[in-house]
Regions:
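Alpha-helical transmembrane segments in multi-pass membrane proteins
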Residues: 8, 22-76, 87, 91, ...
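Residue-level signature of transmembrane alpha-helical entry/exit and packing/kink sites
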Residues: 10-11, 27-34, 53-57, 87-92, ...
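Lipid-exposed faces of alpha-helical membrane segments in multi-pass integral membrane proteins
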Residues: 33, 37, 55, 59-63, ...
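Membrane-interface helix termini and inter-helical loops of multi-pass transporters
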Residues: 74-81, 111-121, 154, 190
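Helix-boundary and loop/linker segments of multi-pass membrane transporters
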Residues: 80-82, 121-129, 159-161
Length: 268
C-alpha cells in the first residue's frame, strides 16, 4: 500500500515537473522542473526492474529533453552535438574496454572480491544479470542520470553561474541523488558495515566526486557519450563481475572434499 502511494506521488511529481519545466519561464523554473521530475522518477521506479524501469527512464528522459528544448538549449549545449559523435563514441569505446579490464582483474583478486559481494545478485540468473547490465543500467539508469546532470542541468547551471560553479552544483546534486540507493546498498552489500548513515555519507561524497569527474570528461570531450560510457562500464561491469564472484564463492562453499571422504577405518 505504501509503495503504491509512493509511486502515485512519484508519477504526479514527474508529470508536474515536466509541465513546470516546459511552461514556467526562466532558468530557475526549468531547474526546479527537472529536479521535480527526477524526484518523481526515483519514487516511481523504487524496487522496479526490467521493462517498466527502462520505459519509465526513457519517458522521463524525453520529458527532460522537452524542458531543454522549451528553454532554447540545443544539442551541443547538452553534449549531443553531431560534430562530437565520432570522437565521443571512439573515446567511449576505449573507456568501456579499459574499465572492463580493470574491474575484471579486480574481481579475480581474492582480497578485493568482497567489494562485489552484493546480495541483490546472489540468486539472480545469468540472463537477468545480462539484462540488467545491457538494458536496465544503460537505458534506465545511465541515460537519465547523464542527460539530467551532465546534460540539461549542467547547461542550465552554466546560464546562472560560472561554469566551475555549475560543475560543483550539479555534482553535489548527483551525490544527494544517491542517498536512497545508498540505503538499499547498505542492507545488501557485504562491503558496507556499521551505521547506515556512514554508508550514505560515504556514497554521497564518492558519487559527488565522481560527478565532478564525469562533468570534466563531458566538457573536455564536448560529448555526453564518454561520461555515459564510464558510468555504464563501472556499474554494468561491476554487476557482471559480482555475479561471477558470487558463483565462484558459492561453488567453493558447496564443495567440501573433506566432508565427502569416507573414513576407511569406519565400519557400520
Amino acid at each position: 500500500m505504501r509503495r503504491t502511494v509512493s509511486r502515485k506521488m512519484g508519477a504526479g511529481a514527474l508529470v508536474v515537473g515536466v509541465a513546470m519545466g516546459v511552461y514556467v519561464g526562466g532558468t530557475v523554473g526549468a531547474i526546479v522542473g527537472v529536479l521535480l521530475a527526477m524526484i518523481g522518477f526515483q519514487a516511481l521506479t523504487r524496487g522496479v526492474e526490467g521493462r517498466p524501469y527502462i520505459v519509465t527512464g526513457l519517458l522521463t528522459t524525453a520529458g527532460l529533453a522537452l524542458i531543454a528544448w522549451a528553454h532554447g538549449l540545443d544539442a551541443p549545449e547538452v553534449g549531443l552535438g553531431r560534430s562530437t559523435w565520432v570522437h565521443g563514441i571512439a573515446i567511449a569505446v576505449g573507456i568501456v574496454v579499459v574499465v572492463g579490464v580493470v574491474i575484471g582483474i579486480a574481481g579475480s583478486i581474492p582480497r578485493l572480491q568482497h567489494l562485489f559481494a552484493d546480495e541483490r545478485i546472489t540468486e539472480v540468473s545469468g540472463l537477468e544479470t545480462t539484462r540488467k547490465a545491457l538494458l536496465d543500467i544503460p537505458f534506465g539508469t545511465v541515460l537519465i542520470e547523464e542527460f539530467a546532470f551532465r546534460g540539461v542541468l549542467l547547461a542550465l547551471g552554466d546560464v546562472l553561474w560560472p561554469l566551475p560553479w555549475a560543475v560543483v552544483w550539479t555534482s553535489v546534486l548527483f551525490g544527494l541523488w544517491h542517498i536512497s540507493p545508498a540505503l538499499e546498498m547498505h542492507d545488501s552489500h557485504q562491503a558496507t558495515q556499521g551505521s547506515s548513515w556512514t554508508t550514505v555519507v560515504g556514497t554521497v561524497i564518492f558519487t559527488g566526486l565522481s560527478g565532478v569527474g564525469f562533468a570534466i570528461l563531458r566538457l573536455w570531450t564536448g560529448s555526453l557519450f564518454p561520461p555515459a560510457a564510464l558510468h555504464w562500464a563501472a556499474n554494468g561491469t561491476g554487476v557482471v563481475v559480482g555475479w561471477f564472484v558470487h558463483r565462484r564463492l558459492r561453488r567453493r562453499t558447496e564443495y567440501d572434499p573433506v566432508g565427502e571422504r569416507e573414513d576407511p577405518g569406519h565400519t557400520d
